Amino acid sequence: MIPAKDMAKVMIVMLAICFLTKSDGKSVKKRSVSEIQLMHNLGKHLNSMERVEWLRKKLQDVHNFVALGAPLAPRDAGSQRPRKKEDNVLVESHEKSLGEADKADVNVLTKAKSQ
């Protein structure tokens, strides 16, 4: 068995180590600057990708609106006032026509459904 003097020395050394490390029960590991920068860049990239996807959808909506033959009213740069309710053009009231590419897509879809 270990003598009491040696045990007291070991206890004092262990106590000194515990008080001098100043860990306060918290994890000593911290994130490095490069890790934080990487996470920041990833967040910016994901935000940018969401914005690009939103813009792509909006442009597709505009393209579909023009493809349906809805007249576009010319607007000068200075007038940004809201339109009157009567000036709004409803897309459903216009006759929808299928272009050649759209007809091909419909034919492919009908063949796929029948299988």
Swiss-Prot record:
One protein family per Pfam: Parathyroid
Effect annotated for changing K58A: Reduced affinity for PTH1R
Signal sequence region: 1-25
Keywords: Cleavage on pair of basic residues, Disease variant, Hormone, Secreted, Signal
Effect noted on mutating L59A: Strongly reduced affinity for PTH1R
Region described as Disordered: spans on this chain: 73-115
GO cellular component: extracellular region; extracellular space
Residues covered by region (Important for receptor binding): 51-69
Compositional bias of kind Basic and acidic residues: 84-105
Cell compartments where the protein resides: Secreted
GO BP annotations listed: adenylate cyclase-activating G protein-coupled receptor signaling pathway; bone mineralization; bone resorption; cAMP metabolic process; cell-cell signaling; G protein-coupled receptor signaling pathway; homeostasis of number of cells within a tissue; hormone-mediated apoptotic signaling pathway
Source taxon at top rank: Eukaryota
Prodomain residues: 26-31
GO terms of molecular function: hormone activity; parathyroid hormone receptor binding; peptide hormone receptor binding; receptor ligand activity; type 1 parathyroid hormone receptor binding
Alphabetized PANTHER family for the sequence: PARATHYROID HORMONE (PTHR10541:SF2)
Family that this chain belongs to: Belongs to the parathyroid hormone family.
Disorder this protein is connected to according to its UniProt record: Hypoparathyroidism, familial isolated, 1: A form of hypoparathyroidism, a disorder characterized by hypocalcemia and hyperphosphatemia due to a deficiency of parathyroid hormone. Clinical features include seizures, tetany and cramps. FIH1 inheritance can be autosomal dominant or recessive.
Function in brief: Parathyroid hormone elevates calcium level by dissolving the salts in bone and preventing their renal excretion. Acts by binding to its receptor, PTH1R, activating G protein-coupled receptor signaling. Stimulates [1-14C]-2-deoxy-D-glucose (2DG) transport and glycogen synthesis in osteoblastic cells.
Oligomeric form and interacting partners: Interacts with PTH1R (via N-terminal extracellular domain).
Name of the featured protein: Parathyroid hormone
Species of origin: Homo sapiens
